Regions:
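ATP-dependent small-molecule kinase phosphotransfer cores
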Residues: 9-98
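Residue-level signal for beta-strand positions within conserved beta-sheet cores that form or flank
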Residues: 7-9, 103, 154-155
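Hydrophobic helix-cap positions at the C-terminus of alpha-helices
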Residues: 4, 29, 57-61, 99, ...
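Hydrophobic/aromatic beta-strand patches that form the interior of the parallel beta-sheet core
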Residues: 14, 69, 106-108, 157-159
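A glycine- and Lys/Arg-enriched "phosphate-lid" helix/loop adjacent to the NTP-binding pocket
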Residues: 72-143
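NTP-dependent small-molecule kinase module
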Residues: 1-3, 115-184
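Active-site donor-binding loop signature of nucleotide-sugar glycosyltransferases
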Residues: 16, 48, 112, 132, ...
Length: 184
């Protein structure tokens, strides 16, 4: 983020859930370890956040030709709610189509073995509702992300996150720079 804010590119940094005021409220509900939410309600809360986010932040900035960096988006929903919550991936994709959600030009998939990822999450902060799920939940999500990447390798790029932070940053930055150069 700091790197791109120093450059003379028009960039937006955002996240889901939580990239709008409504999204912040939804994020609080979704991540609260005390929340008990059905899989279907979880999906619809995420989609409510997403449509608000796309309508008020993503689409207006795309129209201004800004570069948008979004921490989580449609692939996360397919992985978490599709494989993680055992909801129909086809129905999720149909919902994405119905809502006319833009497909990212590039998705960066930072991959780590599940156990290593959970160790990092534990060190970072108190675990949220998703992070507290059992190991099989996380393994199914990782598997889903890897399957998505194999199906769409021109859009979803896989990076081994077990390498040094500096090397990972360099590798990801090189790819992003290449993509920006190709599109401008």
């Amino acid at each position: 983020k700091k790197y791109y804010l120093k450059k003379e590119l028009e960039v937006i940094f955002t996240k889901e859930p939580g990239g709008t005021e409504l999204g912040k409220d939804i994020r609080g509900i979704l991540l609260n370890p005390e929340s008990s939410i059905s899989s279907e309600a979880e999906l619809l809360l995420l989609m409510a956040d997403r449509i608000e986010h796309v309508t008020t932040k993503i689409n207006p900035n795309l129209k201004k030709n800004k570069i948008i960096f979004c921490d989580r988006y449609i692939d996360s929903t397919i992985a978490y709610q599709g494989k993680g919550r055992n909801l129909s991936e086809d129905k999720i994709k149909e919902l994405i189509d119905i809502l006319n959600l833009p497909i990212p030009d590039l998705t960066i998939l930072l991959d780590l073995p599940v156990e290593d990822g959970l160790l990092r999450a534990n060190k970072r902060n108190e675990l949220d509702r998703f992070e507290k799920e059992d190991i099989n939940f996380h393994k199914s999500i990782r598997k889903s992300y890897l399957e998505l990447q194999k199906k769409d390798p021109k859009r979803i790029f896989l990076f081994d996150s077990s390498i040094s932070e500096n090397k990972l940053f360099e590798n990801v930055l090189n790819l992003i720079e290449k993509k920006i150069h190709e599109s401008h």
